[in-house]
C-alpha cells in the first residue's frame, strides 16, 4: 500500500516513455502542474488515501526510518496542494475541490506517521555513515579534481569549516533563514546550513567574515559586482563553500523537529577568480541504499536531473517531446530537459568569487556570524510556522474529512 501510494503521487512518465520520480529529494511538481488533480490519477490517489485511512496503513510498517521518509514525502505533496496562490489563479479555479479532497486525507495520514521525539533522535546520521564507508577522501586532490571528497571535519565546531548565519545571528523574524532561497524552495521541510573554509584555518575564515561585514555598503543592482570587483574581498583560491540540507519531520505532538538525515551536501572549491574555474561536488541521499544501512552517494559529473529547484515554469514533464527538445537545445544544444549540478548552481550563483554566495548579500552589511546549527534550525521552524500551509496542516491533521 505504501509503495502504491508513493508511486501514484510521485512517479511521472513523459510521452516518450521516460520515467521520473523513483528516488528524488523533491516531487516533480511545478505551480502549473495538474497531474494530481485530473483523472484518472486523481481518482486513483483518492482511492488509495481512503484505503490507507480505513485500513490504518500507518501500522503496516513500524521501521522509524521508513516512516520518516514517507511522512516527509506526503508533507511535500500537502504543501503543494495548500499553495494559497494556486486557488486564486483563474485557470486553476476548477481544481479547488480536488485540492481540498487530497489535503483533507493527506493531513491525518501525515500525523499518523509521526515519530516520537525519542525515535527521531535515533534516526541515523547519514553524513557519519557516509564517512564511515571510506568511499570518499576527506580532502580534494588537486591532481584529480574530478573526484568528489567529503570533509570529515565539516561539522567540527572548532575545525576549519565555519558554519555561519547572516543577520548578526538574530532569531527569526529579526533575521531570515540564511539560505533563504533554498529554504523557500524546500517549503521549510528542510534546514540548510552554509559553511565556509578559507586556506589558513578557522581564524582566517573568521577574519574574512569580519572584512565582509565591515565592507562599505553599495547601492543599486550592481552592488554585489562592485563589492567583489573592488579587490577588497576576493575569496582566495582554494576557498571552499558548502551547503548542507537536513530533513525536518513533524513529531507525534505536531511539532517540527530536525533530524540527522542529511539529504544533500553541495561543495564548491574556488580556483582563481572566475566561477567557471570552480569545482563543484554534490552528495545526495538515496532511500533504498539508506534503508540498507548506507549513507550519501556522490553525484557523478555527467549525471543529469530535471531542473526543479527555483524554477517557476510550466510542468516540463507534460510538454511534448519535440517541445522539450527545442527548449533544451536552446540551452545546452541537446535533447532532454535535464541539467547537471554545475549548471544548476551557476544559474543562480552567477557572479564570481565572494559575490556568488547569495547568503552574504541578503542584507548590507550582512552581519555574518559564526554559529552553532541549532539557531539556524530555529529560524527555519519559526519561518515555516508563519506559513499558511503549516497552519492548514495543523487544522486538518486531527480527523479525516471527506
Predicted regions and their residues:
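Generic structural hydrophobic/aromatic packing signal, biased to beta-strands
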Residues: 196, 209, 241-243, 265-268, ...
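Sequence context surrounding c-type heme c attachment/ligation sites in exported
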Residues: 1-19, 257-402
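A short linear-motif detector with a strong N-terminal bias
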Residues: 220-222, 243-247, 325
Amino acid at each position: 500500500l505504501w509503495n502504491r501510494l508513493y508511486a501514484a503521487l510521485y512517479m511521472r512518465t513523459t510521452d516518450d516513455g521516460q520515467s521520473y520520480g523513483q528516488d528524488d529529494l523533491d516531487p516533480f511538481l511545478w505551480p502549473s502542474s495538474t497531474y494530481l488533480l485530473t483523472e484518472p490519477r486523481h481518482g486513483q490517489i483518492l482511492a488509495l488515501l481512503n484505503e490507507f485511512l480505513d485500513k490504518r496503513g500507518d501500522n503496516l510498517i513500524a521501521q522509524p526510518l521508513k516512516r520518516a521518509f514517507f511522512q516527509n514525502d506526503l508533507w511535500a505533496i500537502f504543501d503543494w496542494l495548500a499553495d494559497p496562490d494556486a486557488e486564486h489563479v483563474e485557470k486553476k479555479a476548477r481544481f479547488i475541490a480536488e485540492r481540498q479532497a487530497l489535503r483533507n486525507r493527506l493531513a491525518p495520514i501525515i500525523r499518523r506517521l509521526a515519530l516520537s521525539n525519542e525515535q527521531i533522535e535515533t534516526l541515523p546520521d547519514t553524513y557519519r555513515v557516509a564517512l564511515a564507508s571510506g568511499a570518499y577522501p576527506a580532502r580534494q586532490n588537486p591532481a584529480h579534481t574530478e573526484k568528489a571528497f567529503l570533509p570529515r571535519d565539516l561539522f567540527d565546531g572548532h575545525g576549519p569549516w565555519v558554519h555561519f548565519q547572516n543577520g548578526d545571528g538574530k532569531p527569526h523574524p529579526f533575521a531570515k533563514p540564511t539560505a533563504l532561497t533554498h529554504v523557500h524552495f524546500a517549503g521549510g521541510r528542510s534546514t540548510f546550513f552554509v559553511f565556509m573554509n578559507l586556506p589558513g584555518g578557522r581564524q582566517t575564515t573568521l577574519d574574512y567574515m569580519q572584512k565582509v561585514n565591515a565592507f562599505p555598503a553599495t547601492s543599486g543592482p550592481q552592488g554585489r559586482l562592485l563589492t567583489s570587483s573592488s579587490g577588497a574581498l576576493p575569496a582566495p583560491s582554494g576557498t571552499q563553500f558548502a551547503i548542507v540540507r537536513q530533513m525536518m519531520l513533524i513529531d507525534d505532538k505536531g511539532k517540527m523537529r530536525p533530524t540527522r538525515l542529511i539529504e544533500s551536501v553541495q561543495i564548491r572549491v574556488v580556483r582563481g577568480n572566475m566561477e567557471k574555474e570552480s569545482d563543484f561536488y554534490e552528495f545526495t541521499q538515496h532511500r533504498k541504499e539508506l534503508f540498507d544501512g548506507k549513507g550519501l552517494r556522490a553525484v557523478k559529473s555527467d549525471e543529469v536531473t530535471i531542473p526543479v529547484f527555483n524554477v517557476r515554469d510550466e510542468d516540463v514533464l507534460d510538454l511534448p517531446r519535440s517541445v522539450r527538445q527545442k527548449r533544451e537545445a536552446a540551452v545546452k544544444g541537446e535533447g532532454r530537459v535535464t541539467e547537471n549540478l554545475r549548471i544548476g548552481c551557476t544559474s543562480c550563483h552567477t557572479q564570481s568569487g565572494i559575490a556568488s554566495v547569495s547568503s552574504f548579500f541578503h542584507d548590507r552589511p550582512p552581519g555574518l556570524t559564526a554559529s552553532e546549527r541549532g539557531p539556524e534550525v530555529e529560524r527555519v521552524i519559526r519561518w515555516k510556522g508563519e506559513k499558511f500551509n503549516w497552519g492548514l496542516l495543523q487544522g486538518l491533521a486531527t480527523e479525516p474529512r471527506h
